Design a protein with these regions (language model features):
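Hot-dog-fold acyl-thioester-processing enzymes
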Residues: 1-81, 143-270
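Short, surface-exposed secondary-structure edge patches
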Residues: 2-3, 87-88, 187-189, 275-278
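HotDog/MaoC-like acyl-thioester-processing domains
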Residues: 2-7, 88-176, 281-283
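Hydrophobic residues positioned within well-ordered beta-strands of beta-sheet architectures
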Residues: 13, 82, 98, 117-119, ...
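Compositionally biased, intrinsically disordered low-complexity regions
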Residues: 17-18, 106, 117, 125, ...
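Short, low-complexity cationic-aromatic patches
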Residues: 54-55, 87-92, 244, 276-282
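A cross-kingdom feature marking solvent-exposed beta-strand/loop segments within repeated
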Residues: 77-88, 103-104, 266-273, 277
């Protein structure tokens, strides 16, 4: 709960997660991503990768979900991702572990039953290589309204080196031999500052979001425990199961991929990402 957090606390999250083929396929297919790096092993190897590359949205979801039990299981809402950077590529069979530092705690001046916790998290693979680093802000309930909870912020945030693991260009590789597998108009020279794309695809979110969230080991009860919500429906947004925010975030990446990311060797950074409204089963992104 909010009163349990202090700036400077460090959590080495338990469990870890080995990315198996089932999880890879479930999330890659659900997201509607079209980048051949996530679909075609021969294409990925031609471009210098070891095999199929996990989409950035999947890497994000695996690592964020590992932090939930310690950080946001008692959250009202996940508010914002900040400076989300991607590092070493992630493959099927890689094991990811996560660590989080509490950067700041800010009790609400309007609602005494809640406040915002600001964290910095990092995900590493089995070789200790950083695969993702990000900050996020979470609105969290208080358990005891009378419990002391002071506003505080670290003077210096954790400095995490996160370098994209993009294979070097190799003149000896025949990249053009498989260029037909990606959309033609999504190369670097096709984009201009100020271009606006209205993406033509969408995806209905059904009750399958519960199973997808479970596959990630995300333990937040607002995504899976309707009985809990029914005990006090006014406390919870919409009074029903809310879709884990990483799912619509992942859909936004996938739906935009054929217009923006088909020829991307890697996503580098998301400077910010906000959850400005809830998604429920039956909504279309």
């Amino acid at each position: 709960y909010l009163e349990d957090f202090r700036p400077g606390q460090v959590f080495r999250h338990k469990g870890g997660k080995t990315l198996n083929e089932g999880l890879f396929n479930a999330f890659t297919d659900f997201s509607m991503t079209t980048n051949p790096l996530h679909k075609n092993a021969e294409y990925a190897r031609l471009h210098g990768f070891k095999g199929l590359v996990a989409p950035p949205g999947l890497v994000m979801n695996v690592v964020v979900s590992q932090t939930v039990e310690d950080i946001s299981e008692n959250a009202r809402a996940n508010l914002e991702y900040i400076n989300m950077r991607f590092g070493a590529p992630v493959y099927i069979g890689d094991t990811l572990e996560a660590e989080t530092t509490i950067v700041g705690v800010a009790p609400s001046t309007k609602d005494p039953d809640r406040g915002v916790v600001h964290v910095s998290s990092v995900g590493r693979n089995q070789r200790g290589e950083v695969v993702i680093a990000f900050e996020r802000k979470v609105q969290i309930w208080k358990n005891d309204l009378a419990a002391p909870c002071e506003k505080g912020e670290l003077e210096k945030k954790p400095q995490i080196e996160c370098t994209p693991g993009i294979p070097a260009y190799d003149r000896g590789r025949d990249y053009k031999s498989k260029s037909h597998l990606a959309n033609r108009d999504t190369f670097f020279e096709d984009f201009n500052a100020g271009d606006v794309y209205e993406h033509s695809r969408g995806r209905l979110v059904t009750e399958e979001h519960i199973a997808l969230t479970g596959q990630l080991d995300n333990t937040s009860q607002v995504h899976c425990n309707q009985f809990l919500i029914d005990q006090n429906p006014e406390k919870y947004i919409g009074g029903r199961l809310i879709v884990y925010g990483g799912i619509p975030f992942n859909l936004c990446l996938g739906i935009s991929c054929p217009d923006i990311g088909d020829n991307s060797p890697a996503d580098i950074v998301y400077t910010t990402g906000r959850h400005v409204g809830p998604i429920f089963a039956g909504d279309t992104v």
